[in-house]
Amino acid sequence: MALVFSALLLLGLCGKISSEGQPAFHNTPGAMNYELPTTKYETQDTFNAGIVGPLYKMVHIFLSVVQPNDFPLDLIKKLIQNKKFDISVDSKEPEIIVLALKIALYEIGVLICAILGLLFIILMPLVGCFFCMCRCCNKCGGEMHQRQKQNAPCRRKCLGLSLLVICLLMSLGIIYGFVANQQTRTRIKGTQKLAKSNFRDFQTLLTETPKQIDYVVEQYTNTKNKAFSDLDGIGSVLGGRIKDQLKPKVTPVLEEIKAMATAIKQTKDALQNMSSSLKSLQDAATQLNTNLSSVRNSIENSLSSSDCTSDPASKICDSIRPSLSSLGSSLNSSQLPSVDRELNTVTEVDKTDLESLVKRGYTTIDEIPNTIQNQTVDVIKDVKNTLDSISSNIKDMSQSIPIEDMLLQVSHYLNNSNRYLNQELPKLEEYDSYWWLGGLIVCFLLTLIVTFFFLGLLCGVFGYDKHATPTRRGCVSNTGGIFLMAGVGFGFLFCWILMILVVLTFVVGANVEKLLCEPYENKKLLQVLDTPYLLKEQWQFYLSGMLFNNPDINMTFEQVYRDCKRGRGIYAAFQLENVVNVSDHFNIDQISENINTELENLNVNIDSIELLDNTGRKSLEDFAHSGIDTIDYSTYLKETEKSPTEVNLLTFASTLEAKANQLPEGKPKQAFLLDVQNIRAIHQHLLPPVQQSLNTLRQSVWTLQQTSNKLPEKVKKILASLDSVQHFLTNNVSLIVIGETKKFGKTILGYFEHYLHWVFYAITEKMTSCKPMATAMDSAVNGILCGYVADPLNLFWFGIGKATVLLLPAVIIAIKLAKYYRRMDSEDVYDDVETVPMKNLEIGSNGYHKDHLYGVHNPVMTSPSRY
């Protein structure tokens, strides 16, 4: 019923959504990742036996030894094909005989064990009966007489130890029986819980299916919102992509032009500084020369006075006179050429404001997103309307699926099934209580027998007195012997009944394990069901014939089980495409075409981009031909490297002052000292402006020298790069816009194709997972049949059978051991006085004193009481 529901559900869904061909599920850049909500089921996939698991494995190993043959796949097929064993004239009797022989050969291990069990069942009562009659005739150990032998203590100990070991092994088997019996009761009680768990899983499946449909519908809304987000931001998305393609080409040349604009400003500033420095230098040099000439003339006048011609001043004055020629300026700034022409040219170039033209080029590129955003307003609106209409269709489709009616029908079926199980499972528990009670009785019977043996050993061992003769044994020892014989009696009385139970449960349990549980675990049982023409002669594939009335569809139980176990959807697992092919109705291409038609109207027109106009180009060319590259900068640098004066004025002043101080007081001395002050004043006030002008001139020359280095070649290269980029923009920008527009359209379309492919995948592979079906099947076979019934049953017969089989040696040993513990009516005595302290008895024919043979009472040979 669940399968029918799922098929109807998918029919309703597939009738509204469409595509062609098997979906090529792929990832789209920027697309959303979809995943159906995970459904958590309650029932476990595997069944853990718990602490009794090793015991079950031990039984499985035993069964593998008894029945080592592989699952008889071919034999089972033959049996099913010959299910009508019509023993008639026309029947193929030899084939049936061969088949029976194959069955017997396969079951040889089980048959041997069963035959041995039957022999045990038949012989043990007979042996017990004959043994009882034999004992009643004072035979078979029934005579209360014991012949003492020298190895009697050793035999007693060996027999006692052997019986103890056997009883311990029997106890172990009885414990297995108790455990298995209790496991059966516990597991059967858990059957109802397991069944309810599976029903809850089916209810979860029914509950989650509408949620999965709602989730699929909601994901279209999320996909649409994602597309709307890209459409609303088409300027930044599409425009950004176009801009990103243009920037690597445009940015380098604009940066070069921008750097050249900066160089123009720097050149203009350097020329201005150079021009002003030249003027300042000429003025300062002229003033310096004038002042130095005045001081030189003053010194010459002092040297020409009469005071300097007479001794002793004449020698000093003569030493001053040669140095006067160096008191002057070394600069020749008036001969440095002017740079006013170059300055005027560069000033005119700078008026063009090349930097603003570069910014305009950048702005043209940066405005592309806004341009695209403004041009696509109407087209974006139409695309949104188309996507909204598809959204409305999907919502109408989801509302038109008769999901509620289907869920009600399936839920009603599940409720009826659950109600039926709730009514029948208590009966199963009632029957199980009978089995449990019977199992307890069996286990307690064996426990009683083993208890008698243990009590016999306990009383016999601890009550035995090695100094007491057989007729004088104590009460405790005698009681031990009686317990042993009681165990023997109960053993003969019940062992055959126990063996009947063991044989029946062994045959059933072993075959269930080997023919159902193991082949189900390795899926060979499903291979039997998948055999063509086996379950129905006219059908090649039984499952597809049963579900679709089309036995030619290659659908097998094993494949369906494997797919359901993996959590695959019902549509794919049961190949419902043979009922309704989603590909015939799920027309992804049609939906994609509708969206693509609207996206094709997305035309973007970007006017020709001009990075730099003719004015800017002319400015670059004028700058290249401004003449700054023809200036003889070495002349200026050579001039700036000169010292403003031919001699160091401070040194000259100090020398003059020292010589003046050597002169006697008079006018020359006073005049020289005044000249020293004037020289120092010239050095302090007139020399710094000259030096500053020289430094400024030097810095400006250096700047211009660097800027003008290969200036025409640089400008030519920039213009060539500009022409190349401009040519690229003129010829390729439209192609870039068209290409990126198509990519944008494909991205938007890809969102929906990705969504539609996912919907197809979700419907066919994930939606309405049939995992609960495989879990329910595992629960029925692995869980209930094998785990709850077969394994405890096998452990039960294994334990009880082990204890029952060990009864045989236990009975034999107990019979022999009882003679050593029970009090005898008579005994044999050795002639050796050291062995028995009674010698004055008649000698019998066998060498022993047997007083009772002659009717003479002998207190040593007889016991005062008899048990």
From Swiss-Prot:
Residue spans, topological domain Extracellular: 20-107, 180-434, 509-794
Cytoplasmic topological intervals: 129-158, 456-487, 816-867
Protein topology in the membrane: Multi-pass membrane protein
Tissue-level expression: In the submandibular gland, expressed on the apical side of epithelial cells. In the parotid gland, expressed in the intercalated ducts. In the sublingual gland, expressed in intercalated ducts. In the extraorbital lacrimal gland, expressed in the intercalated tubules and larger intralobular ducts. Expressed in the retina. Present in urine within small membrane particles (at protein level). In the embryo, expressed on the apical side of neuroepithelial cells and of other epithelia such as lung buds, gut and ureter buds.
Keywords: Acetylation, Cell membrane, Cell projection, Cilium, Endoplasmic reticulum, Glycoprotein, Membrane, Phosphoprotein, Signal, Transmembrane, Transmembrane helix
PTM info: Acetylation at Lys-226, Lys-258 and Lys-265 by NAT8 and NAT8B may control PROM1 protein expression and its function in cell apoptosis.
Transmembrane segments: 108-128, 159-179, 435-455, 488-508, 795-815
N-terminal signal peptide: 1-19
Gene Ontology annotations of biological process type: camera-type eye photoreceptor cell differentiation; retina layer formation
UniProt keyword Signal present: yes
Residue numbers of Phosphoserine PTMs: S865
Pfam families in UniProt: Prominin (PF05478)
Gene Ontology CC entries for this record: apical plasma membrane; brush border; cell projection; cell surface; cilium; endoplasmic reticulum; endoplasmic reticulum-Golgi intermediate compartment; extracellular space
Cell compartment(s), UniProt: Apical cell membrane; Cell projection, Microvillus membrane; Cell projection, Cilium, Photoreceptor outer segment; Endoplasmic reticulum
Modified residues (N6-acetyllysine): K226, K258, K265
Principal localisation: membrane
Keyword Glycoprotein found: yes
Traits of the deletion mutant: Progressive degeneration and functional deterioration of both cone and rod photoreceptors associated with impaired morphogenesis of the disks and OS.
Glycosylated residues (UniProt): N273, N291, N332, N374, N415, N554, N581, N732
Assembly: Interacts with CDHR1 and with actin filaments. Interacts with NAT8 and NAT8B.
Family: Belongs to the prominin family.
Misc remark: Fundus images and light microscopy of retinal sections from transgenic mice expressing mutant PROM1 reveal progressive retinal abnormalities visible as subretinal deposits and photoreceptor atrophy.
Task performed by this protein: May play a role in cell differentiation, proliferation and apoptosis. Binds cholesterol in cholesterol-containing plasma membrane microdomains and may play a role in the organization of the apical plasma membrane in epithelial cells. During early retinal development acts as a key regulator of disk morphogenesis. Involved in regulation of MAPK and Akt signaling pathways. In neuroblastoma cells suppresses cell differentiation such as neurite outgrowth in a RET-dependent manner.
The protein's name: Prominin-1
Lineage: Eukaryota, Metazoa, Chordata, Craniata, Vertebrata
